[in-house]
Amino acid sequence: MNIYTNNVNNANVCNNANRGFVRALILLVAAAATIGTAYGGVPLNNLQGTGGIAFNPLAYTAGRPWEGGETNILNGIVSKPQVGGWYVNLTDADINWFALGAAFTVADRLEISGGYAGINAHNYGDNSLNTYNIGAKLRFLDENAFETSWVPALAVGGVFKYTDSETVDALGLRHHGADGYVVASKLVKETPIPVLLSVGGLVSDEVVYGVVGHNRYGAAVFANIDIIPFEQIALGFEYKQGVRVGDGITNHDYFDGHVAWFVNKQLTLVGAYAYTGDKDRFYRDGHTDRLGVGGGFVLSLQYQF
């Protein structure tokens, strides 16, 4: 396979899609700014659909309660759904990545999520790469449990993942895999500015976030920190350690800095810059350690019903 195949037509399609996405985002921002005075928040639907930020899950479960409180029979049984869309433009590698996710929570404890991503990596010979995810997360300890102000929310979860791509076969990897994780999250309100802290451990077989396939299992850690200087704004940093997945393959650490605007109680907009490692490390040097796909800008639109 020629890993540096250029496809001008696909590049033009991506450019048109990029412009359409930005136009739609501007229209939604303008419309949302005219309604609502209450503000949404985390968790968002991350790139795999799980309730979290961008790469990482949070211990909080997705979905708002229904109106009517205890008089609504759905409350305590199933939450409202929430959805999120992502556009990732990894300019270093000329990769365009669109992701959609949805999630809801059962019995105020068990989050069920799903996600899809379509990725165009035409410079690497793969114009149509698709990933599919199904996740579940159980929050087994509530934030501030035992009448305290310091206990974090704790959750365990997993994501089953499938990658549909010729690249998987070309690299001798598996199409399917799974993640398992445990995560603790805490909103600290005693500081001058509220701070959201989250840290967790991950077991995964992913190669480049599962985008190019799956191999053997390894362990890693992840963390998030966000400050909330204004009721409608959060500024944060996200870290995800690269997993060693056998056969000399190690993923690069992932980083992103982001800003979230809670437009109203339903709509949240996110802008970020993400870095995933040297895009040419394997193709230039033949190394399979610290694999990445470069860096670029990220936009997200999240909606909580």
Language model features: what each stretch is:
Residues 167-168, 210-211, 282-284:
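Short acidic, glycine/proline-rich loop/turn micro-motifs
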Residues 1, 8, 152, 195-199:
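Low-complexity, intrinsically disordered short segments enriched for Gly/Pro and polybasic residues
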Residues 40-191, 203-207, 229-233, 243-245, ...:
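Transmembrane beta-barrel domains of Gram-negative outer membranes and organellar outer membranes
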Residues 1-54:
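Cleavable N-terminal export/targeting peptides
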Residues 196-244:
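A mid-sequence, solvent-exposed acidic-amphipathic segment
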Residues 247, 280-292:
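Solvent-exposed loop segments that connect transmembrane elements
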